[in-house]
């Protein structure tokens, strides 16, 4: 009788441990974020509008710990410096006389934000206007040579680092590297 009780206790303990592991895996799966970069050159109204976004296509929120943008292998800290390098962009001050006829470059930040599942954050937006055809066309072409590195964590502090580009066929894009914590980049993209 004692042997049977010991056997039942051992099986109960094994079942409890397996149930706990299954529950932990279920919670992790139900809070899993997955970040991707999406780039488009037209808005829903078919207006020519370059938009660069980080999108959370996972099921849980993502805490974006670091974000880096590279063009031709060189890191950039802002969209203005990137466009100056790739596309001969010249920033116009809002107080200058030519500002009224100047198509603005809209900038955003990704690092340090929390993206809910299904949410997107735009970090560059540049509409085609009467004054910027050459710069806009150069940026549309340069986006093919852009790469991104992003590190993000779930609400359970599971973290991943991804090397991305806008085209989804980029090798490894669907398999981010799991990391213990996100490294601090030497040159982070800020805005």
Label every PLM stretch briefly.
Residues 1-102, 183-184, 188-191:
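Membrane-proximal alpha-helical anchors
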Residues 50-52, 67, 76-79, 136-138, ...:
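Surface-exposed beta-strand edges and their flanking turn/coil or helix-capping segments
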Residues 108-175:
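Terminal connector regions
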Residues 38, 68-72, 80-82, 133, ...:
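Generic alpha-helical propensity signal that fires on short helical segments
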Residues 79-92, 149, 155-191:
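Acidic, serine/threonine- and proline-rich intrinsically disordered appendage/tail regions
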């Amino acid at each position: 009788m004692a042997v049977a009780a010991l056997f039942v206790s051992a099986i109960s303990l094994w079942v409890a441990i397996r149930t706990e592991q299954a529950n932990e895996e279920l919670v992790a799966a139900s809070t899993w974020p997955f970040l991707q970069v999406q780039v488009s050159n037209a808005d829903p109204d078919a207006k020519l509008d370059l938009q660069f976004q980080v999108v959370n296509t996972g099921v849980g929120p993502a805490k974006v710990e670091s974000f880096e943008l590279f063009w031709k292998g060189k890191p950039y800290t802002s969209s203005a410096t990137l466009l100056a390098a790739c596309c001969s962009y010249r920033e116009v001050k809002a107080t200058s006389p030519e500002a009224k006829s100047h198509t603005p470059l809209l900038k955003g930040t990704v690092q340090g934000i929390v993206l809910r599942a299904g949410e997107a954050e735009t970090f560059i937006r540049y509409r085609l206007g009467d004054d910027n055809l050459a710069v806009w066309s150069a940026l549309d072409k340069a986006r093919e040579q852009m790469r991104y590195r992003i590190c993000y964590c779930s609400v359970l502090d599971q973290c991943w680092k991804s090397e991305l580009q806008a085209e989804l066929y980029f090798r490894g894009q669907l398999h981010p590297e799991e990391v213990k914590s996100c490294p601090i980049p030497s040159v982070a993209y800020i805005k």
